[in-house]
Amino acid sequence: MDWTIPGILNQYGQHLDAAMRAMFEKNVLPEAGQQIIEVLLQNPGKRIRPALVLGTHVAFGGNVEDVLPLAAVVEWIHTASLIHDDIEDLDHFRRGAPSIWNRFGVPYAINAGDQILASALAHIANTPWPSKPRLKLLQRVLLELERMTVGQQMDLELERKGVSFEQYAKLCSGKTGAI
């Protein structure tokens, strides 16, 4: 097996795509919500985070099918954070295409980011994993979401004031490092 990020995604990328799509198959989203999810699925990012989840699990002898829901959740949470970040930073483009807020409008983008986060948390809560590890995972994800939002708040504040190296390192740890 090729243990690089591209190698892991080459091996398991289609499984990840299916798991990500499955998270929204049972949701009855209005048309715009469905369009946003489809746009996001058709224009994926590098998917480093889910590749790390999948690769680590398989490297330690786990079955990839057991961890696909978590890998999908991690990527959706990251995607939701990017939707919100693009609004806050007024970024018109993401991944070479119009950002979600630029394409659908700010209200739809905010709602899509919130919907994705809620669906990700519900997906964890409803997985068939044993209760204790599922609760620990949910607690950890909520803690990291809190760290991520604090990091984003720091980013917004530091844009106004300027930033030292220590502040920037702390900001990165919160924003991108949290998830």
What would you call each of these model-derived segments?
Residues M1-F24:
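N-terminal amphipathic/basic leader segments beginning at the initiator methionine
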